[in-house]
Amino acid sequence: MQPNSHIFVIITISSLIITVSAYGSTGTIAAAFGENGFFCAIDASGKQEVICWDRGNTNRSLNRPPGEISGYSPPMTSLSGGEGFLCAITSNTSRAFCWNLEDPSENLVPRAFQYNSYLQIASGNNHVCAISGLYYSGPDYGPVHCWEYSDNTNFTSGLLWNSSFHNPYIDSLMFRKIVSGDGFSCGVTKDGDLVCWGPKSNLLNFSNNEEFEVLASGRNSVCGVSKDSGQLHCFGDETEFGSLPNRPRFIALSAGANHYCGIREDDHGVECWGRNLNSSSSSSAPNTSGFVAISSSDSTTCGVRELDLVLDCWRVHDSSKADYSPPLELCSPGMCSPRGNCGDGWFAFNASILKESELTSLCSFHNLNICLRCGISCLEGYFPSSTCNPNADRVCTPCSLCQNSSCYGICKIRATKSKEHEQKEQREVRRLVIIIGCSVLGFLVMLIGLSFIPKMTKGSKRDDEERSKMTCCFCFDKNSVEADPDPVPHQSVLLPTAVSLGETKIFRLSELKDATHGFKEFNELGRGSFGFVYKAVLSDGIHVAVKRANAATIIHSNNRGFESELEILCKIRHNNIVNLLGYCSEMGERLLVYEYMPHGTLHDHLHGDLSQLDWSMRLKIMLQAARGLDYLHNEVDPPIIHRDVKTSNILLDGEMCARIADFGLVSSNERDSSNSDREGDVYDFGIVLLEILSGRKAIDRESDPAGIAEWAVPLIRKGKAAAIIDRNICLPRNVEPLLKLAELAELAVRENSNERPNIRNILCFLDLIVKSGLTF
């Protein structure tokens, strides 16, 4: 019999599987709503400790109490957020534990329920419901218990456990899953019925009998995904969910104040919708990694990335900075369960991918599994290089590494790759024909030449002695090379095109014109204060970079100054410097020939379209760039002050080694170095360090503040260096070296130049960090 004094709704559905992660739902990451809102997540250390962070970006572990927290809370297996508070199921005893940030160690669960065991919990606006049972064993269903708080600002002032949520009919049911909102809870019974109860449950206005496989609740609404059609349905207050997206099915949902977000089944990307949300707002979710878990507060959504289990947060209603800056911690991808076999379309998370030798499971009980949904495809710019299996999800690989036809279509490069492959085969055939032809011709010439040797031995040697030799007058310490036998008067000495490191050559103007196709724009690599830089291929096939001075540079400098600078540049040789190979000064031109750097600039890898750099590569680049700058400051005589150290002047060679570029040809006044000049280079190098650590541009007009130093330094000085670390790439297990590097960058960009370290000290510190290595 159903008491009339209680309102509830029943929707009959069969064999329901629900994944929830939202307001009033259960997951490994959850958010408390309201002015006193905060996020918490379960870490991936295997201890199931809880880490929380609030709007002030104060990060704390509830299990490792800092000085401002008295006592501590137990490890937990699942979390659920309410209005200003969170509740959880403890991992060791399967009991309920609720808290707020005023005193996280105080359990707000009424004493009558504190010693009961629960397998799931769902926090609402000011009430909590939990399913009796053990999450780690036994049946996955049980009766539901509810309690209510009369005052959210003082939870202990009124506990109405025998309240409007107490219902004899509800007490008689066995539930598998539950969610809660403002004045209502909904649960899936053992028989597959969806039942909603509470004083406001009638406002949900359910209008169909869909079978939902995913369900989430907001304050005054519920959204679900149909198991059969994959279609999204929402009920209740339309201002919370707005227009629904027409997308492939979602495998998880999360609800905020006026928005919902979902993880797509196919590529595990996140999409958001709701009131006043457009396509650009929806796309504010990170697109460099899929997600395994998400949760929302009023206007912010946070999630656990599938790439590296790192937390990421973003604002949904606008593109400004997120309210919450999560700590650099790896978090659990899902809830622990006693399922031995995860089933079709699922895989069991393997803790070995975290590469911690002693870590075998993320669950307190090692017989438990974390079952996650398989991905089918990958985000744009990636292709699946392996498919999902019972022990691992599919692997997504950048399209830049696509090497065969299996990924051409996905990466949209089939036609290009096929054409390149055909052209490569044609070049190989032509090369083979040329080699065979030249070999035969050479053999014939040798036979003919041998027949004339006796007649040539009587020739005069004076012919050779009369051939004059001219050498380069600028590069005194370099090898001399034979010049053209018929030089043009009043022009520079012309050298052969063979180029080798250690020799600085003089090139013909015509030769460099041919090598650059007449200095055409399509061969242009870049532009600078000195002039233009062109990619060139010499007649012997060697790739070089040719820097051509513009008219202003030529007018404002004299020949003697040019020669003096050449004399210095000719002596510079270092593995982390873009070395000068030669020059040309014919017809008033000033052309410098440098080593060609095929992998472009550091700037383009950090901020452009070139491939992303992992942390090992970034640290190596920091160290190598510091070595190059140290060489200029301390080993060259006279010392060279760069005056323009920036990511676009750090180039990467064929082996991805960093080279300092664009440091020569300054005026004689500029060449006079001083300590203040060196400290200026150190400041610029500090900016480079901040760019590498954060992935942010030195000047970003779309951010406030625009300058990277103005943005990063206050955070570092407040002990929040983790907030600047780039989360778009897989983080190392131990981020402490990165935080130390942030502190080093802060020293380098100090306003008082006397407080900055010199480049030699920076180099020593970087060397120690790189030698210690990073653990991934």
Swiss-Prot record:
Top-level taxon of origin: Eukaryota
Residue span, Protein kinase domain: 519-776
Tissues where the protein occurs: Expressed in roots, leaves, shoot apical meristems (SAM), and floral buds.
TNFR-Cys-type repeats, residues: 341-396
Presence of keyword Ribosomal protein: no
Signal peptide from the UniProt entry: 1-22
Residue numbers binding ATP: 525-533, 547
Chief place of localization: membrane
UniProt-listed InterPro entries: Kinase-like_dom_sf (IPR011009), Prot_kinase_dom (IPR000719), Protein_kinase_ATP_BS (IPR017441), RCC1/BLIP-II (IPR009091), Ser-Thr/Tyr_kinase_cat_dom (IPR001245), Ser/Thr_kinase_AS (IPR008271)
Glycosylation sites: 59, 92, 154, 162, 205, 278, 287, 350, 404
Function text: Serine/threonine-protein kinase with low activity.
Name assigned to this protein: Serine/threonine-protein kinase-like protein CCR2
Gene: CCR2
